[in-house]
Amino acid sequence: MSNEFINFEKISRESWKTLHQKAKALLTQEELKSITSLNDNISINDVIDIYLPLINLIQVYKIAQENLSFSKSLFLKKDIQLRPFIIGISGSVAVGKSTTSRLLQLLLSRTHPNSQVELVTTDGFLYPNQFLIEQGLLNRKGFPESYNMELLLDFLDSIKNGQTAFAPVYSHDIYDIIPNQKQSFNNPDFLIVEGINVFQNQQNNRLYMSDYFDFSIYIDADSSHIETWYIERFLSILKLAKRDPHNYYAQYAQLPRSEAIAFARNVWKNVNLENLEKFIEPTRNRAELILHKSADHKIDEIYLKK
């Protein structure tokens, strides 16, 4: 174990799955398929072995958060205010963050049927393409400087204080922020925040996004495996884009397969891999839990902060 993981307890899949006794997955195969991202691979057994114990662990943290909030209120002689439980999920492009986020949202909704469970992605806090072009940053999209961190931190602050908050909406089909469209959040019980940058402290030194998190997860994998998944996903996106001339990726959809693969590999090497190695992976040890994936997308190791 490297020094980076010295403060984590390594748990094998076999050991982890014994931490939950229920054999029921809480969702159907059809529901699981509907929330699984392109070229991701997850089974009902993965839900039972990995995610049901994870739901148990999140409940442990939520109870601890509520107890601490109660004790603080007594100490300060103030009325008790239950705040939203915020979960941050980070990891590389194409590693499976979206699948994990949607699955957790569904499972938390099933295990807490009277609770409001919401999901937001930090893609919505990217600057619009026009602004990135004007600043000469379009080729740096996804890097720290391409996010409106002040807006994102203000959003999280509003959520944490029980206020109604609004998030911009990003479309991968148009590769841009959707003008005049907002996603509203009205004091949810749980909020899942998913994005490559959720543990970073970009342009603002006041605080980290993770200061607002009650629990946090990093999805990890060998970069060579993620490269393969990224290229496979890119090819799948091109197939879909052929049917929609307005899709951003339609301009690449007619490329011969070999050229499309070469293009995707170049983007991976010069954009996504650089971003991963310089800005995303170095934040890994800020997570409470690291889920490591093997080449077949299966989670084989779990690291829990001590």
Curated annotation (Swiss-Prot):
Cysteine pairs bridged by disulfides in the record: none
Keywords: ATP-binding, Coenzyme A biosynthesis, Cytoplasm, Kinase, Nucleotide-binding, Transferase
Pathway: Cofactor biosynthesis; coenzyme A biosynthesis; CoA from (R)-pantothenate: step 1/5
CDD domains with a match to the protein in the record: PanK
GO CC field: cytoplasm
Gene3D superfamilies found in the cross-reference section: P-loop containing nucleotide triphosphate hydrolases
Compartments where located: Cytoplasm
Gene field: coaA
HAMAP family for this protein: Pantothen_kinase_1 (MF_00215)
Taxonomic classification: Bacteria, Bacillati, Bacillota, Bacilli, Lactobacillales
Short name of one Pfam family: PRK
Reaction equation(s) it catalyzes: (R)-pantothenate + ATP = (R)-4'-phosphopantothenate + ADP + H(+)
Protein name: Pantothenate kinase
Enzyme class: transferase
NCBIfam families hit by this protein: panK_bact
Keyword Kinase: yes
InterPro entries linked to this entry: P-loop_NTPase (IPR027417), PanK (IPR004566), PRK/URK (IPR006083)
SUPFAM superfamilies the UniProt entry points to: P-loop containing nucleoside triphosphate hydrolases
Alphabetical GO biological process terms: coenzyme A biosynthetic process
Family the UniProt entry places it in: Belongs to the prokaryotic pantothenate kinase family.
EC numbers for this chain: 2.7.1.33
Gene Ontology MF terms in the entry: ATP binding; pantothenate kinase activity
Residue positions binding ATP: 91-98
Chief location category: cytoplasm
